[in-house]
Amino acid sequence: MGTALVYHEDMTATRLLWDDPECEIERPERLTAALDRLRQRGLEQRCLRLSAREASEEELGLVHSPEYVSLVRETQVLGKEELQALSGQFDAIYFHPSTFHCARLAAGAGLQLVDAVLTGAVQNGLALVRPPGHHGQRAAANGFCVFNNVAIAAAHAKQKHGLHRILVVDWDVHHGQGIQYLFEDDPSVLYFSWHRYEHGRFWPFLRESDADAVGRGQGLGFTVNLPWNQVGMGNADYVAAFLHLLLPLAFEFDPELVLVSAGFDSAIGDPEGQMQATPECFAHLTQLLQVLAGGRVCAVLEGGYHLESLAESVCMTVQTLLGDPAPPLSGPMAPCQSALESIQSARAAQAPHWKSLQQQDVTAVPMSPSSHSPEGRPPPLLPGGPVCKAAASAPSSLLDQPCLCPAPSVRTAVALTTPDITLVLPPDVIQQEASALREETEAWARPHESLAREEALTALGKLLYLLDGMLDGQVNSGIAATPASAAAATLDVAVRRGLSHGAQRLLCVALGQLDRPPDLAHDGRSLWLNIRGKEAAALSMFHVSTPLPVMTGGFLSCILGLVLPLAYGFQPDLVLVALGPGHGLQGPHAALLAAMLRGLAGGRVLALLEENSTPQLAGILARVLNGEAPPSLGPSSVASPEDVQALMYLRGQLEPQWKMLQCHPHLVA
């Protein structure tokens, strides 16, 4: 359905009119730099461009008091000295004669985006706005924010569109206390915020930014705070937070809409955040969110003050919303001790309210020794202090050379053994008819008796041709079919062909009667995960087997708690998903697995289906590999005790080697 980009050039008008070192970083170039980069990359042209409208005062009143709206309206006629005096009554705020107009446009852009997504005009989108909004409170401007754009959008989605479950993900580096205050007693809005906290020593210096602030009244458990107590958090820390905290709760909540307070001051190079996450990380975060709410994701710009980092991160977010695969992540995939402490503390605080966490080890852990915030306003961290120096020395090369992988000419191809006239594919998914050379196909088939039959040989030839197209960069992802009797042999050939023709690290996720070939080299180049094995077993660091969970909750726990952490730790450049005889997966479960694995290997995922599964699975897998959202799994269910036991056993065996499995700090060396 497409991606919307909502913007209005008038939002560059508001600016600081006096000297204020605290506020000078919020400047018009934040918008123009991001928009210019989108145009340079050809991304704006691929979006449905919407010109932002002003929010009405009635719409602003969904979250703000009439008196506050009136106060901001009156700034249009104030002089410089009066504006400065009024600004001084708030924390980290400046007003300009155009602020009221710009802030109404910013709020209106979020409303337009929500309307476009919820009416089906587009699938998702980004609103490029300023001033930002997530610190804005019912009767107060705060932290560069005038009207709370995302909160207004959430209230509008409830009132106008009748939504009952809205997820707000705030990945800005500052705590969006404005959103928290507005919805802390509302169970229809699940608010997640990670933020630089430093045990209360970082702005906005609030006790209620800590992990144990979980909402109140009926909203208990619907506020999720993840406080970062050190600077320098990187890609592994952010992905671990999603896998071990946000996504388990989000799947249980089952949102109808995802709103993102998309602040990019949490990216590398930003002077406010001093974090290490590269722009590509936001592509992965976006893609992980797109498996929720039928892909209805609305991102609204918040912070971001390093123009290069901001522009790159915006581009990564938009190209992922457009359905492009996420580029590979850089750096070691091992969360740091401080991140694990914060994640586990948040899990422990949330466990009483969420079934998905109650079956796991979520005991609270003591924080690393530090000076916790005293009563009153604590002293800020000094920029030259030892805690800040690591982030200040962030490698600029990560921004100087952004990951610009050329897109394959074909996003998704399907190679079936026989044409299926009932198969409905997206218009840009091609049905491949070509095959590898007969002599080459026979050579690969020769060691396998099950590949001697003509039907199996034909299927193998089509698979080899498709796989070569993926390895050569002509095709991004694909689906191939094979006779059930030849499924194991065909998978064996696919693995060996991939490793011998360019893949350096191959991840194979095999379901059903598909055992790892005993003579496959144990050289660390392949990671084999067998789901539907006879028992949970870590046969080696690179060979893991687990039974297929019987409940949807167990399946989600397996994907989020085992498969994806292993996959992100391994960082493959080719993923094979094989559904063999007796695989036991229903269409929505297979689609979710493929959609979430698509975040790996630059989206280079090949799904191998045994023929009996092809009619019901080929279409749905083609859609998710092509960038569409998977269907909902329906109402959440808990994992069975047997599934929980298998998962905990495997995590215990594998955590020392695979750091992304960890969500408890005592395991860090």
UniProtKB/Swiss-Prot annotation:
Substrate binds at residues 20, 305. One of its GO terms (cellular component) is nucleoplasm. GO terms for molecular function: acetylputrescine deacetylase activity; acetylspermidine deacetylase activity; deacetylase activity; enzyme binding; histone deacetylase activity; histone deacetylase binding; protein lysine deacetylase activity; zinc ion binding. This is Polyamine deacetylase HDAC10. It catalyses: N(8)-acetylspermidine + H2O = spermidine + acetate; N-acetylputrescine + H2O = putrescine + acetate; N-acetylcadaverine + H2O = cadaverine + acetate; N(6)-acetyl-L-lysyl-[protein] + H2O = L-lysyl-[protein] + acetate. Widely expressed with high levels in liver and kidney. InterPro entries: HDAC_PDAC, His_deacetylse, His_deacetylse_dom, His_deacetylse_dom_sf, Ureohydrolase_dom_sf.
